[in-house]
UniProtKB/Swiss-Prot annotation:
Sequence positions that bind NAD(+): G201, D202, G203, Q204, G205, V206, G207
Signal peptide, first to last residue: none
Keyword Zinc: no
DNA-binding keyword on record: no
Enzyme superclass (EC): oxidoreductase
SUPFAM superfamilies named in the record: ALDH-like
Origin organism lineage: Bacteria, Bacillati, Bacillota, Bacilli, Bacillales
Catalyzed chemical reaction(s): an aldehyde + NAD(+) + H2O = a carboxylate + NADH + 2 H(+)
Protein name per UniProt: Putative aldehyde dehydrogenase SSP0762
Family the UniProt entry places it in: Belongs to the aldehyde dehydrogenase family.
EC number: 1.2.1.3
Assigned keywords, A-Z: NAD, Oxidoreductase
Highest taxon listed in the record's lineage: Bacteria
Length: 475
């Protein structure tokens, strides 16, 4: 069992002021996997002061110094690979292969992308006799969700370090182990004291005072819309900059010239990947009437081949839902789909056979879903596909954009002109054509209620900078 009862503040592991702890539950076993410190306002105050004290010094470090720091982090991150994989499997229930090939790898990708972005990043630009300067914004508060313990953490931390902004970081209390390992990595490579501060705890005890602190100049949050809204309101009191990556209800448009087997495989993966606990999950599968029956046969077969189970068993592809609360929410949405008249094609309520222990859900397909139904409009955060039929391309695009969200979209087909038309028409911050995949140097963020700002690569670095113009600098 993992016991981490200290906070990491000003380059040291220190006792949490409250002396209280929180239990972390392994969702695959429903047993306690470890404990962490339950931080409070006093811990946040100490962390912010430490970050504020080092701000000017860190802001004025050279690009090369920060790039070298990121490179050292990359090397030590690789050294801790097995520790990170095991931690993520314990806290999230991610299958070992997913923990390695997705979670661990995405964290590494973001540190490398930020490091490499500094090669060409322009912090200064001459315009005639004048100078435009980009400089670190100052103390930044980071709050990350439970579904990607290294990805969401690394992309924010790497960007802040590259920009020269010290941080106070609150990971999710449900998946804090990987964040603690990152703190150990930073400590070993010598991240300057105060530049990185880790305060574990819950939203009320840590998240709220961090969002409200007058010395915090920027908040970067990934999570639910209601929490993002609450952070914005708190930040508005002293006009903090806010970067938000929130929910999604992403469309996956299948074109009538698509390879059926390839489309079914791609669409199924976008639903069951990470147990459906993905803000970019393509859960609204929008299929042309002309190929719908063939597609349904194929996608049902793909779902039947998915192995749900013990994340430590070889071959497991899908692990548990993160918690009892989240499991119950997924079950409620499945019940709602049935109640509203969608056709249950595969899966349904309850747990897969033989998986009584752990928060395992059945991968589920609903057919004949109307886009106005609850399961088509609200983020479920579980492995649930809603198949919606369209008759022409304009209707497909209209359905895709008929949502309050705009985080991601997908299109699968053969004709390049049609693929391009659809990709440009989807109202979302990220669109993938034929499973192209998102590279870590591309901007990531949402339209509409899916967020504010952009992350990843040089766009992520920009979020942690202020822009200053100096007139007459070269006179």
């Amino acid at each position: 069992m993992r016991n981490f009862t200290k906070q990491y503040i000003n380059g040291e592991w220190v006792e949490s002021t409250s002396g209280e702890t929180l239990e972390v539950i392994n969702p695959a076993t429903e047993e306690v996997a470890g404990t962490i410190a339950k931080g409070n306002k006093e811990d946040v105050e100490k962390a912010v002061e430490a970050a504020d004290n080092v701000y000017l010094e860190f802001r004025h470090t050279s690009v090369k110094e920060r790039q070298d720091l990121l490179d050292q982090i990359v090397q030590e991150y690789k050294n801790r690979k097995e520790d990170l994989i095991q931690a993520i499997t314990d806290e999230l229930g991610a299958p070992l292969s997913v923990a390695e090939n997705v979670h661990y790898q995405m964290g590494l990708d973001h540190f490398e992308a930020a490091r490499d972005a500094l090669n060409d990043f322009q912090f200064e630009e001459r315009r005639g006799d004048d100078l435009v300067v980009k400089e670190a914004i100052g103390v930044s508060g980071l709050i990350t969700p439970w579904n990607f313990p290294t990805n969401q953490t690394s992309l924010k931390l790497a960007a802040a370090f590259a920009a020269g902004s010290p941080v106070v970081f609150k990971p999710s209390e449900e998946t804090p182990f990987a964040a603690i390992i990152l703190a150990e990595i930073f400590d070993k490579v010598g991240v300057p004291k105060g530049v990185f501060n880790l305060v574990n705890g819950d939203g009320q005890g840590v998240g709220n005072p961090l969002s409200e602190h007058p010395k915090v100049r920027m908040m970067s949050f990934t999570g639910s819309g209601p929490t993002g809204s609450s952070i914005m309101k708190k930040a508005a009191e002293d006009f903090k900059k806010v970067s938000l990556e929130l929910g999604g209800k992403s469309p996956y448009i299948i074109l009538d010239d698509a390879d059926i087997d390839g489309a079914a495989s791609a669409a199924a993966n976008k639903v069951v990947f990470n147990t459906g606990q993905v803000c970019t999950a393509g859960t609204r599968t929008i299929v042309p009437a002309s190929i719908k029956e063939d597609f349904l046969t194929a996608v049902k077969e793909k779902f039947s081949q998915v192995k749900v189970g013990n994340p430590r068993e070889e071959g497991t592809q899908v692990g548990p839902i993160i918690s009892k609360k989240q499991f119950d929410q997924v079950q409620a949405y499945i019940d709602k789909g049935i109640e509203e008249g969608a056709e249950l094609l595969y899966g349904g309520p309850g747990k897969p056979e033989g998986l009584d222990k752990g928060y395992f859900a059945r991968p589920t397909i609903f057919n004949n879903v109307d886009n106005s139904m609850t399961i088509a409009q609200e983020e479920i955060f579980g492995p649930v596909m809603s198949v919606i039929t369209y008759n022409d391309l304009d209707e497909a695009i209209k359905i895709a954009n008929d949502t309050k969200y705009g985080l991601a979209g997908y299109v699968y087909g053969s004709d390049k002109d049609t693929l391009h038309k659809v990709a440009r028409s989807i109202e979302a911050g990220t669109v993938e054509i034929n499973e192209a995949g998102r590279k870590p140097d591309l901007p990531f963020g949402g339209y509409k209620q899916s967020g504010l700002g952009r992350e990843w690569g040089d766009y992520g670095i920009e979020e942690f900078l202020e822009v200053k113009s100096i007139a007459g600098y070269y006179n």
